[in-house]
Design a protein with these regions (language model features):
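Long, solvent-exposed N-terminal ectodomains/accessory regions
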Residues: 1-188, 192
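Acidic-and-aromatic substrate-binding clefts and catalytic sites of carbohydrate-active enzymes
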Residues: 10-15, 19-46, 51-64, 76-92, ...
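Surface-exposed flexible segments
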Residues: 49-52, 60-68, 102-148, 234-258, ...
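Non-catalytic propeptide/linker segments at domain boundaries
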Residues: 191-314
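Catalytic grooves of carbohydrate-active enzymes
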Residues: 212-230, 292-307, 314-316, 326, ...
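Acidic (Asp/Glu)-rich catalytic clusters
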Residues: 309-315, 330-353, 375-381, 464-467
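Core alpha/beta catalytic barrel or barrel-like domain that forms the active/cofactor pocket
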Residues: 347-357, 385-393
């Protein structure tokens, strides 16, 4: 059952190539070569899994080296390292039909070049890189230098839509936002090129109406069930605006813009005989009785805690980890790696909000059941019994209103009759409920990675004092890049009696004694972003 929802794949080749990147993504230095190489990677990996890129341990997606070792160990792949751009072009020049020149003075031109590269089988280059691609016999496909000088982003993408959109993939689109300006980090471009996606960074901010109308045009043209890959453009709009907009169309988001190697990862299935087995601490039909104490559970979201999994200390405390469930479709080996390397204290949960990152208060009612059925099937494959929900459409980053309307809660309870329960929020939220034996508990606390641990301890002790009714069920969201080691001392200094539990035991106990009030988002609750 473990591979039921993975596209049928032929056996990947056993002799592949690897490259190592550094952390220099500056437009003036490291970006041009990296952009060319990830475009070449997308072409080289279109028919075979030929090229894998390893990033440094302090890159945001820190698992590229462990996953590289996993491919060698579990799939029997032997890699030859390519150390130079020249050598990469020599090896893979047959995968490319030519090159597209982007204008380093006009940032959006890189996205246009990526779009053309996917459609025309090209690599993207700046003016300085033209000699090296010509040396390897590549011919010019298009030259964007000067084409978009002085134009607004809306003008640039309006032109690109007219020229290229009709030829692009309608099941997938690349929102290549994220870092902008002096630093750009398009590590996911290989995937967009392989899949012939349209690349853009159009704003979802109503204040930029000329861009928003184009953004909506693209979303409206996508097929039902489509996915947006990438991430919103920093400094132009907010994550809340972008995700709310996608959710209004019933479209899933899979990020980030710098998630590497999908063109390679998508070609591997789970290893023969592999089946997900989660670290359940309690049977689904078990009945537990809460005592007069404080129960705490820690949850890491953000795609299995971006940047945390390989750090020391994991396993010392019970932790739940939100899994990007759609990786069963385009990165199965990564999910198998996480499950293989999990400790008994690591517990996997579904999310975020469904079969992709979405804001459920805004999902169209006719799409909600279909999307949640997809999520339910993925959770079955992944042996997950808890769904994590997040809706920040009315919030301001990690603060503000992250609550769910009652009709949204109703829809979740109807869609997931067999889960142990639900966790809600990102920052603290107030939505809580209990129906039959399935609680919905919102986070009471959010641990910012930069907050000193003694202040985190003081905050949690204050919550324990303020919430004097026992048992008190304290769900804590541990933001990405917070390592487990840093929380061990926090737990040791909490004022008891306190027990840190795995999430499934926590929810079972929360079902036994409802000391929390049922609450949903109200129409007159304050909102930061009023919507569209």
């Amino acid at each position: 059952m473990g591979s039921a929802f993975v596209f049928a794949k032929k056996e990947p080749i056993k002799n592949a190539y690897s490259m190592r990147f550094d952390l220099d993504w500056e437009v003036a230095s490291g970006l041009p070569e990296k952009a060319m190489l990830v475009s070449l990677q997308g072409l080289a990996n279109r028919e075979e899994a030929q090229l894998y890129i390893i990033h440094p341990p302090d890159f945001q997606w820190e698992i590229t080296e462990p996953l590289f070792d996993f491919y060698k160990r579990k799939h029997g792949v032997s890699y030859t390292e390519i150390k130079t751009v020249d050598a990469a072009l020599e090896r893979f020049k047959s995968s490319a039909k030519g090159y597209v020149v982007w204008d380093a003075e006009v940032g959006p031109s890189l996205n246009i070049a990526f779009t053309i590269a996917g459609l025309e089988d090209g690599v993207v280059v700046t003016e300085a890189l033209i000699p090296i691609v010509q040396k390897h016999g590549l011919k010019p496909i298009d030259d964007l230098r000067g084409r978009y000088t002085g134009q607004s982003h809306a003008e640039i993408y309006s032109d690109a839509i007219k020229r290229y959109w009709h030829r692009c993939n309608r099941d997938k689109i690349m929102l290549m936002g994220g870092h902008r300006g002096r630093v750009m980090m398009p590590a996911m471009a290989d995937w967009g090129i392989r899949e012939r996606m349209f690349f853009h960074e159009l704003s979802a901010d109503p204040e930029e109406a000329d861009e928003l109308v184009l953004n909506r045009q693209l979303l409206e043209d996508l097929n039902v069930g489509a996915t947006v890959f990438g991430w919103h453009p920093y400094g132009k709009d907010t994550e809340e605006q972008s995700t709310m907009l996608l959710s209004m169309y019933g479209i899933k988001m899979e990020g980030l813009h710098n998630l590497p190697n999908l063109s390679y990862n998508c070609q591997f299935d789970f290893t023969p005989g592999f089946r997900f087995t989660n670290n359940h601490q309690v049977a689904k039909d078990a009945v537990l009785i809460a005592e007069e104490k404080v129960y705490i559970t820690f949850v890491q979201s953000d795609s299995v805690g971006i940047g945390v999994w390989t750090k020391p200390g994991r396993g010392k405390l019970p932790f739940a980890w939100q899994v990007t469930m759609n990786w069963t479709k385009f990165s199965p080996a990564a999910l198998e790696y996480f499950h293989e390397s999990a400790t008994p204290n690591d517990y996997f949960i579904g999310g975020l909000s469904g079969p992709g990152y979405m804001y459920p208060n805004n999902i169209p009612k006719d799409r909600f059941p279909v999307l949640m059925e997809e999520a339910k099937q993925l959770m079955t494959v992944l042996d997950e019994h808890v769904m994590e929900i997040m809706d920040n459409s009315a919030a301001d980053g990690n603060v503000g209103n992250a609550d769910l309307f009652e009709e949204t809660v109703d829809a979740y309870y109807e869609a997931f009759p067999d889960v142990l329960g639900f966790i809600n929020g990102y920052g603290p939220a107030r939505t809580r409920d209990l129906r039959d034996s399935r609680p919905m508990i919102s986070y009471d606390y959010y641990i910012d990675p930069k907050r000193p641990r003694d202040e985190v301890t003081a905050d949690l002790n204050e919550l324990i004092t303020l919430n004097s009714k026992r048992p008190y069920f304290l769900a804590v969201h541990v933001r990405e890049s917070n390592d487990v080691n840093s929380l061990v001392t926090v737990v040791e200094n909490l004022e008891g009696p306190v027990e840190v539990l795995a999430l499934d035991r926590f929810l079972k106990l929360a079902a036994s004694n409802k000391t929390y009030e049922t609450r949903f988002r109200k129409e007159d609750d304050p909102v930061h972003f009023k919507g569209y």
